[in-house]
Amino acid sequence: MNDTTKPLFGTADASYQAAGELAGIQQLVTDFYQIMDTWSGATKIRAMHKSDLSQSADKLTCFLSGWLGGPRLYQERYGSISIPGFHAQWPIDAQARDAWLGCMQQAIERQPFSADFKGYLLAQLSVPA
């Protein structure tokens, strides 16, 4: 497939495909929470979560699936979501935002995604953060 026929990230399911579909998203989320658990820069945001991260991981996986153009698993399992409303339950400041993005940046770098998709994904995740 050449550049003129390659789907653009953010259209249809191009981002979902670029992420490796559900298995790729699950690996990204697994790495994200592993980094959050071990990186000293994430201590503040790790404390905002329960000790068992399995539900948080499932919710993030489900959210990212739909957000990237794949199956809307979050809505199926948990109902509708409003990002500002969801985040209102925590005292998120610039330090917490930067820690979350730092964990995600490190997790993205571990993935076998294309360099273009890595840059795109981090930029898009920075918008709601």
Predicted regions and their residues:
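Core of compact, soluble alpha-helical bundle domains
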Residues: 1-129
